[in-house]
Amino acid sequence: MFAIQPGLAEGGQFLGDPPPGLCQPELQPDSNSNFMASAKDANENWHGMPGRVEPILRRSSSESPSDNQAFQAPGSPEEGVRSPPEGAEIPGAEPEKMGGAGTVCSPLEDNGYASSSLSIDSRSSSPEPACGTPRGPGPPDPLLPSVAQAVQHLQVQERYKEQEKEKHHVHLVMYRRLALLQWIRGLQHQLIDQQARLQESFDTILDNRKELIRCLQQRAAPSRPQDQA
């Protein structure tokens, strides 16, 4: 959008246009394929502009908040030079941007860092096994056979101790039973001896009683004939 500067003819649309009725000179294309009336009016991306002064935004004379804006380059040799459209880039900043963009390494360019990083990080680029995936079997540990033998030896000792305890318990029970049987037999012998003694005592008592009865009968027999006489 451009603002119409005061003093321009109604028929002219851009700065530097000739008034109506005048013959226009032969138009020649510039390097940007734009047909312009003069060399100064050619849009050469402002090459050759003195001072490369930044354009200044100027409002129209009506002071109304419109979108029409015009660029004014102070110090320009002629007023007929066409100002660039709104949003055009300054030619001075254009090479800097191009240079800054050139410093960024594109994917198609190889400045040596990509190959070196690939060579250095070749180990890291290889896929590493996940945490949950099982690793391959490592070298056998020489201590494992000795540990297994020690564990087996301990297990054998524990079993032997348990067997010895069971045997000791069985032997103890058998000894207790034998002792109990011997005690019972001893009691039986004692009982038999006591029964024999009692029988002898009873026999002695019976014999003594018989003797006493016989003696009493003999004493009573001689006294009876004397009484009859």
From Swiss-Prot:
Residues 1-144 are annotated as: Disordered. Signal peptide: none annotated. InterPro entries: DUF4653. Residues 62-71 have a biased composition (Polar residues). It holds the Pfam family DUF4653. Residues 84-93, 115-126 have a biased composition (Low complexity). Belongs to the UPF0500 family. This is UPF0500 protein C1orf216.
